[in-house]
Each structure stands twice: as C-alpha cells, then as structure tokens.
Amino acid sequence: VNTPNPLLPIIARDGDNIIVQGPITIDNVVSVTQRGAALFDQPHCVIDLGKVTEVDSTIISMLLEWLRAARQGGHQLEFVNMPASLASLIQLYDVAELIPVTPRHTEHQTAI
C-alpha cells in the first residue's frame, strides 16, 4: 500500500484551483516553490492554502517567488483559505500589501 507521507507537502491541480496540502517549512520550501510554479498555466490561478498544516517564515519567500514567477508568465495568482498561522506571518513581516489574499473561497451559488 502506497500511503502518502504526512511530512511531505502535496501540490495538485483540482479543476481551476491549485491545492497545497501539508507542511511548508525550510526543509521543503525550495521543492514546493518549484513544483507550485510549474502549475501556473492559466491567466488566473487560485491557490488554496486551506490544507497547509505547518509553516515557518520561509513560506513568505515562497509566496513572493510564486507571485514573481506568475507575473513574469503573464498569470495572476489569488491565495484563498489561508491558515491563521500564515496570516500572522504575513502581518509580522508587513507584506500583506504584496500578497493578494481572499479570506474565504466560495463557489458561485445559484439562488433557488
């Protein structure tokens, strides 16, 4: 049985979204940064961070690198479902104006 390692992050496309799951720390941030940037293939990419389980300050550099890579490729990124621990780091490092965050990602719903 091939069980995913809970210590290794998963980055995968789910429709129009890019889902990031697991820890993002100094131990894996370079790999995660490269793997994530490779998925920026649409004009507007939604990055769902709701399943990120652990962060350290290196995630800030990852998000900024993703924004730079997306801008160079003509893409726009939107980060959604940000964990409180990451939101705190963004405030601590005073980069909230640089990182576009949507507080909660909701699907378009039709009134019945």
Question: Which sequence ranges carry the predicted segments?
Answer:
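STAS-like cytosolic regulatory interaction modules
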Residues: 1-55, 65-112
